[in-house]
């Protein structure tokens, strides 16, 4: 099941990130961490109240198995853009859950008039690159500081790519 985040979801989101393996957390947060704190979890849970969106994938046991967050980018040039970040439970990777989350996020962003999604990631993040290729979205990547890159997905150019 997939649904939008709600203000009371902070503890479930924190638990999800605590259950991710070290490599997954490193890819998501660019460093060693054991999870996220209560404040960050509540921030993720309230994404919709700040003009963005958030999605949770819920497993059959009721636990969060995927999270995607869309946050408005302050002062972006060239139109309205949002930062996108996604994480999928280690044992659920490679089964299409990330694609489902990203496609739902793209539909949400388009409904809200967002023109582009941007993400910062570790350079050469093959799973994210593969996810973008599977979704059929036009995207471009640009290096940032050593070890990091940013990608941009132009939503207006990909209106027919995602149903």
Could you tell me what each predicted segment is?
Residues 1-163:
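Long, contiguous binding/interaction regions
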């Amino acid at each position: 099941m997939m649904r939008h985040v709600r203000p009371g979801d902070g503890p479930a989101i924190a638990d999800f990130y605590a259950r991710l393996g070290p490599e997954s957390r490193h890819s998501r947060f660019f460093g060693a961490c054991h999870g996220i704190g209560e404040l960050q979890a509540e921030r993720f849970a309230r994404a919709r109240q700040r003009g963005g969106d958030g999605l949770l994938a819920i497993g059959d046991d009721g636990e969060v198995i995927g999270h995607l967050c869309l946050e408005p980018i302050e002062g972006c040039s060239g139109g309205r853009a949002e930062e996108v970040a996604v994480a999928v439970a280690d044992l659920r990777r490679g089964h299409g859950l990330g694609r489902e989350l990203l496609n739902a996020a793209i539909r949400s962003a388009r409904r809200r008039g967002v023109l582009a999604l941007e993400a910062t990631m570790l350079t050469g993040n093959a799973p994210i690159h593969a996810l973008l290729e599977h979704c059929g979205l036009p995207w471009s990547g640009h290096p940032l500081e050593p070890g990091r890159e940013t990608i941009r997905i132009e939503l207006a150019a990909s209106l027919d790519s995602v149903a």
